[in-house]
From Swiss-Prot:
Entry-linked SUPFAM superfamilies: DBL homology domain (DH-domain) (SSF48065), PH domain-like (SSF50729)
InterPro entries tied to this protein: ARHGEF39, DBL_dom_sf, DH_dom, PH-like_dom_sf, PH_domain
Gene Ontology MF annotations: guanyl-nucleotide exchange factor activity
GO BP of this protein: positive regulation of cell migration
Annotated ranges, domain PH: 227-331
Keywords: Cell membrane, Guanine-nucleotide releasing factor, Membrane
Protein name (record): Rho guanine nucleotide exchange factor 39
Occurrences of domain DH (ranges): 22-197
PROSITE patterns: DH_2 (PS50010), PH_DOMAIN (PS50003)
Function: Promotes cell proliferation.
Tissue distribution: Strongly expressed in hepatocellular carcinoma (HCC) compared with their non-cancerous counterparts.
Species per Swiss-Prot/TrEMBL record: Homo sapiens (Human)
């Protein structure tokens, strides 16, 4: 039944018109960006993957490590684009969702891909020359292979934004409303899983870096399974005597205090010796001074069952960042 309005303006009809304009604008953006995305996928598939296969410059395991599921993702885009061009958004995106697992696989391989690229550029002269030659093609517009490799993960975020907007601006009586709503949900769930994979990879990188900075028997396995939050120098204020600089590494469950090795140490110069581990679940944190945000720095008090730490910094902003990170770590252990 059509709604009729006695006046010249009808709020319901105006709202529908706004939805339709937003829907049309979003659909147009999805189509235009998909064309560009598919073009870039095709450039890599043609000028890198295809030629590398033909020339044998990289062995199949190395090629697979570098590009992962790229060709299958390219195929999924080739399936989707005709539906978008024909205005069959719901049907096209419903079919596209069957390929979302490819993006999970691509994300899980992304760190290995970047590592393989750097290793091969360093040690494989033929591959290095080939990459430079292909990157110089005008079709790439100055983009390097390392800039193009994250493209599918960037596109997944665009998919989420655009498909969610498309679903939100599609009325419940539209024939493709259910298809678009389901596609938006599945794409958002995939984007969240990919984000989680990326966060874990970044954390693993931090843990390897921190573990490499620690030396000595006590340091073995200290970072295994932990979630890194921050690190930096702070001054430890003892009951008597002068404050001593120490390096601190904060994880969600512990605060690690480390002392720098002597610079002239034959084997371990530039590393740190672990001096203490403080459990965040048993920590009570307070600011002794440094609440005002002034230029004079501040002092934090960390109380544990058998010890109390006073940590000082002359940088007020840095101390505030530490305070917020410590607060978050303590809260995460008590929830």
């Amino acid at each position: 039944m059509e709604l009729s309005c006695p006046g010249s303006r009808c709020p319901v009809q105006e709202q529908r018109a706004r939805w339709e304009r937003k829907r049309a604008c979003t659909a147009r953006e999805l189509l235009e960006t998909e064309r560009r995305y598919q073009e870039q996928l095709g450039l890599v598939a043609t000028y890198f993957l295809g030629i590398l296969k033909a020339k044998g410059t990289l062995r199949p395991p190395e090629r697979q490590a570098l590009f992962g599921s790229w060709e299958l993702i390219y195929g999924a885009s080739q399936e989707l684009l005709p539906y978008l061009e024909g205005g069959c958004w719901g049907q096209g995106l419903e079919g596209f969702c069957r390929h979302l697992e490819l993006y999970n696989q691509f994300a899980a391989n992304s760190e290995r891909s970047q590592t393989t690229l750097q290793e091969q550029l360093k040690k494989n002269k033929g591959f290095r020359r080939f990459v430079r030659l292909q990157e110089g093609r005008p079709e790439f517009g100055g983009l390097q292979l390392q800039d193009l490799l994250p493209l599918p993960l960037q596109r997944l975020q665009q998919y989420e934004n655009l498909v969610v907007a498309l679903a939100e601006n599609t009325g419940p009586n539209s024939p493709d409303h259910q298809q678009l709503t389901r596609a938006a949900r599945l794409i958002s769930e995939t984007a969240q899983r990919v984000h989680t994979i990326g966060q874990k990879q970044k954390n693993d990188q931090h843990l390897r870096r921190v573990q490499a900075l620690l030396s000595g028997r006590q340091a073995k396995g200290l970072t295994s399974g932990r979630w890194f939050l921050r690190q930096g120098w702070l001054l430890v204020v003892p009951p008597h005597g002068e404050p001593r600089p120490r390096m601190f590494f904060l994880f969600t469950d512990v605060l690690l205090m480390a002392k720098p090795r002597p610079p002239l140490h034959l084997l371990r110069s530039g590393t740190f010796a672990c001096k203490a581990l403080y459990p965040m679940a048993q920590c009570h944190l307070s600011r002794v001074f440094g609440h005002s945000g002034g230029p004079c720095g501040g002092l934090l008090s960390l109380s544990f069952p058998h010890e109390k730490l006073l940590l000082m910094s002359t940088d007020q902003e840095e101390l505030s960042r530490w305070y917020h990170s410590l607060t978050w770590a303590i809260s995460s252990q008590k929830n």
